[in-house]
Amino acid sequence: EANKKKEEKIKELQEFISRFSANASNSKQATSRKRALEKIQLDEIRPSSRKYPYIDFRPNREIGNEVLSVEGLTKTIDGVKILDNLTFTLNHDDKVAFVGGNELAKTTLFKILMGEMEPDSGSFKWGITTSQAYFPKDSTEEFNNDLTIVDWLTQFSEIKDMTYVRGFLGRMLFAGDDGVKKVKVLSGGEKVRCLLSKMMISGANVLVLDEPTNHLDMESITALNNGMMKFPGVLLFASHDHQIVQT
């Protein structure tokens, strides 16, 4: 029994190390896991104190065949052509990762698709059965107010019951008095967890995520990865996390 626990712990640590050691923002956590692996002894196995959020995106409506049609989108910013005659179509079972070095192009495309920016030319059309939830790369404006976490999330929920709303916050490890904290004083990681709560409570069947793993710890990244894999709708996302892109 003890040996089995040891083997499970070693495997868990090895998975964390292999996944995150190459990621600069998480390399410290990976190094500490490495030390734990080196020190591990048979009698040192204790229950893990790490907590994983529970990320589960459940669409309120099944998506139809026609999801998104993009025709000739073009956008120039400060004299630089960011999008040039972009054309593509998405169908009901597509999960699309936007990769590459031009982060501004990805963010610009997402902003246009979410109605936050106008293209210079071209058009796009969402399918009639679609509803979208958006995770922006820069969420500063979302939290520039005096609302508490509970009140902030309630404004995005069709059901205004506080217990219902707190349930979504609880999934993202906001407990008890956390709900009365003002959103404008939250850390980067807490804001990301709020945004993911907002996406879950929306019941959208299309998720658009622009670098969602920024500011997240390894446990939260793992939970997000699992939530994205289980999501039955359409995904459009940009991420530097190779594991999320591959899976």
Segments predicted by a language model, with ranges:
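Coupling and communication elements adjacent to P-loop NTPase active sites across diverse families
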Residues: 2-85, 89-92, 223
